[in-house]
Amino acid sequence: MNERMVDQSMHSEETDFELSLRPTRLRQYIGQNSIKSNLEVFIKAAKLRHEPLDHVLLFGPPGLGKTTLSNIIANEMEVNIRTVSGPSLERPGDLAAILSGLQPGDVLFIDEIHRLSSVVEEVLYPAMEDFFLDIIIGKGDEARSIRIDLPPFTLVGATTRAGSLTGPLRDRFGVHLRLEYYNESDLKEIIIRTAEVLGTGIDEESAIELAKRSRGTPRVANRLLKRVRDFQQVNEDEQIYIETTKHALGLLQVDQHGLDYIDHKMMNCIIKQYNGGPVGLDTIAVTIGEERITIEDVYEPFLIQKGFLERTPRGRKATPLAYEHFAKSNEERG
């Protein structure tokens, strides 16, 4: 799958850029106000008791700040953080090596925790509950169990698929926090802050326009801002103006709802070739040349959230709003 401007997942070249933009304290974190308020209380209470924070599960769509929040938690607790991904923990020994290296109160952040293997997950249970590991060494008749005591720590797990977590793992998290899509006001504030970090001026209209087209996701907002800045610098403008912003977003094929060429391709397929549906997901996948799982996990959620697409027992169906928007878009494109 080609990388899209509106893809909510991180592009390979964006790691350093995102790191430079991440806030380090809760007071700097824009949006997710309910989560911030709760975390402030939980962190303050844990510090008053001189205990590590309860294990935290962060879940929601990609690009909303789960990794950023995990680092903020460590900073607010004044402890170190160790970051790993679920798929990288292939064997119990991988987990044991990391956990045994933690200091009291440290944070272990496991991204994509829903992708932990069942073997590693079972070893994690006593570590989360009672802070010890039971590791089997040797094979057959020579196999023996070794208990490793661990310092109290906080596990922060992040997932885009909370429903894929097993019940026993999910229940061991004391704090469950769902990150929601950002409103346009918060995205506008994020865009203005990012422009300051980049050393680029931006007018308010441009910040509002970018916020509208960012799919409720800071990662998308920052990516679009970077590309619009390219046009501004080539034009040798003193700052980013609305005319440049609209021109750039038009060339990038990101419309006023944050939909791109793939969204248009998929919806036009349903509307034009299959009379608006219902049409099966496999049929759509073959018609537009994309994998079923990519359509289901990447393209569909935002179209459904915006009210353009319905999932029915008989297949996918375009809504009246989709007919209105995509017919108008097709007319504008000629």
Curated annotation (Swiss-Prot):
Mg(2+) binds at residue 67. Residues 1-182 are annotated as: Large ATPase domain (RuvB-L). The gene is ruvB. GO terms for molecular function: ATP binding; ATP hydrolysis activity; four-way junction DNA binding; four-way junction helicase activity. SUPFAM superfamilies: P-loop containing nucleoside triphosphate hydrolases (SSF52540), Winged helix' DNA-binding domain (SSF46785). ATP binds at residues 21-22, 63, 66-68, 129-131, 172, 182, 219. Residues 183-253 are annotated as: Small ATPAse domain (RuvB-S). The lineage of its organism: Bacteria, Bacillati, Bacillota, Bacilli, Bacillales. It comes from Staphylococcus aureus (strain JH9). This is Holliday junction branch migration complex subunit RuvB. Signal peptide: none annotated.
